[in-house]
Amino acid sequence: MRIYLPATAAHLRAALATLGADNDQGEIYLTDVVARAHSQGLSASALVVSDHWLVEGCNDRAQLADLGAELNRRVLRRWMVEGVGVVDPSSTRVDVTVELARDVELEPGALLRGRTRVGEGARVGAYSILTGVDIPAGAVVAPFSLLDGDAPARGV
């Protein structure tokens, strides 16, 4: 896949500032940047992108879901290569901001968000939701737990 862009970042920034959505689809087209450069006598060059996901468009919620699933697949793969166990990658979600130590086990349906950190050998139970918490090494988070370190403390 190739993307054509003006030769300099300054030209790209200037062209991006002029883009509009005055077309039948009401969308902004990056190709208009190349047309603008051409009309001004500027050169454009091709950037070869081997991974189409890095430049994939998103026009509706179905495409947004596809992009999110691909990002999550990559995040989980990275952690599994680092020694994290993921019982069911298709149902497990981990934000890019989460930090996992070696030998962490994530059971099906686990959702880890924000600045969550999970220590070595800890186990996160099925369908647990962790947001902005530190789980110590060797700890066991029970299934269906809801731990939110970002939530304000509430009085009883």
Question: Model-predicted segments: where are they?
Answer:
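Short, solvent-exposed polar/charged micro-motifs at secondary-structure junctions
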Residues: 54-59, 92-98
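Short amphipathic alpha-helical segments, especially helix-boundary/capping motifs
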Residues: 7-11, 41-44, 83-84, 95-97, ...
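General secondary-structure edge motif
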Residues: 14-17, 47, 79-80, 84-87, ...
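Residue-level detector of alpha-helical recognition elements and their boundaries
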Residues: 27, 49, 79-82, 137, ...
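Long, charged amphipathic helices and adjacent flexible linkers at domain junctions
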Residues: 68-96
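A structural motif detector for beta-strand N-caps
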Residues: 84-86, 90-92, 98, 102-106, ...
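Catalytic-core segments of class I nucleotidyltransferases/pyrophosphorylases
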Residues: 1-72, 77
